[in-house]
Amino acid sequence: MDTATHFAMGFGLAGLAYLDPVVASTPSLAVAVMIGTVIGSQAPDLDGLVRLRGTAAYIRNHRGVSHSVPALFLWTGAIFVLIQAIMPQLHWLHLLGWIFLAVCLHVFVDLFNSYGTKGLYPFRDKWVALNAIFIFDPSIFAAHLVGFMLWAAGAHPGHVFLWIYVIIAGYYYWRCQAQRRTTELVRQRIGKAGTFTIIPTLSWTYWTFVAKTDQHWYVGEVISGDVVILDTFSIKPENERIAAAKKSYKVQSFLAFTHHVHVETKERSFGYEVKWIDLRYRSRFQGKSHYMFVAVVYLDFDLTIRDSFVGWIHRGEEQLTKKLDSKRS
């Protein structure tokens, strides 16, 4: 989820904690729990600091081991030690438990969007993305805002957020069911065996999809149950240009993150351009469609890497051209 929703959930858990009689009857503990749940709801995303090492490092590591099973305990322990050092609590087990719940909830809800996490690492070294909830869901955020207003108006925060989280749990179930129904619609439309990835958007009735069969990739959208195929790509075998370009660390980071990839090669005046596109992120800019998340390598005619790029392109091919230098060695 987005940062704002994680913050909202942190405060929401602080309200829910008032169901704990010890928290409710100990003001200093209630404050410590609020600090712990808010920090815990953000902590796994501190891996965003790896962006300072470049986009490739960020892509490879963001929501990776920081969202893994061992990290749940490491984040919890670090936050607990910090709070105990600043404001020691006699009922420290209660504090520890609520911090742990906040960290776990962060990782759990991140599993449901299209970006996904390595939430099952080390038991499974793959990204898990359940594709049921958009990265920012107005309904979930609005539910928390209603809860905060009721809390401010004098309602019991524990009771308020208990009901809110029951409703949100039901909402998650409904969205998962909608995603399954949409998957079946796409499967019927493609009419071939394959893998089908259905991707949520801000709208409840609008989904995008990527489907892979033995010979093709299909990219499209589902609007109120109507399936539309927008792009079709033939799956081609790897050649020596692609193999040479895959030696780039940026490309390796890109391929470690996504498996919804189509690769294209093009001969240029300086040699070759090899471009991978993540088919999940199709967009339009000034009336032209393009894929926003890409990895591109420039090779000379000896298949030596001249330049490379990985990242997001929001304004089309012109923006990409400005980021690469065919003369660099």
Identify what each model region corresponds to:
Residues 1-189, 194-201, 210-213, 218:
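N-terminal membrane-targeting hydrophobic helices
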Residues 188-329:
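C-terminal regulatory/interaction regions
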